[in-house]
Amino acid sequence: TPLTMEEAIVEAKRCLNCKKPGCITGCPISNDIPDFIHQLSRGNFGEARTILAGKTNLPAVCGRVCPHEKQCEGHCVLNRAGKPIRIGKLEQFIADFDADMNLIREKIPPKTRGNVAVIGSGPAGLTVAGDLAMMGFNVTVYEAEDEPGGVLLYGIPEFRLPKRL
């Protein structure tokens, strides 16, 4: 179940802000986990979302689907005591809060660098399309299926990743 605002802040305040954060080492994309958690702990949800957006276009997906117990949470120093920071739940909270409140919208630069076609609208296709759009490319995504989403839509069960995302 998703965290409430109060639960998310309390959970974020448990972070020890390690000098050598294992959570970043355990994250395949090296998210700045301590910084986004610190901002969340202070109630700066928009800033936390901005930090996440620096590395991922899909925090709502990553917060639900990534194997946190093997990655960021598995490398959390508090894991030694059996209770690591619930990083995935915090990422999910920030992404959902942003979607509900419509807080952050990145400024997309003018499309001056040419046209790019992306084949497939799964997580990789959506990520590269978003990154290229932020670099000023005009991006067209092609998808063979009736609905975009790839494995996000067709390969992950509804209870794990709601289709509305």
Language-model-detected regions and their locations in the chain:
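Ferredoxin-type iron-sulfur electron-transfer modules and their immediate structural context
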Residues: T1-N115
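Beta1-alpha1 glycine-rich phosphate/pyrophosphate-binding loop at the start
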Residues: T1, S30-R42, I51-A53, R80, ...
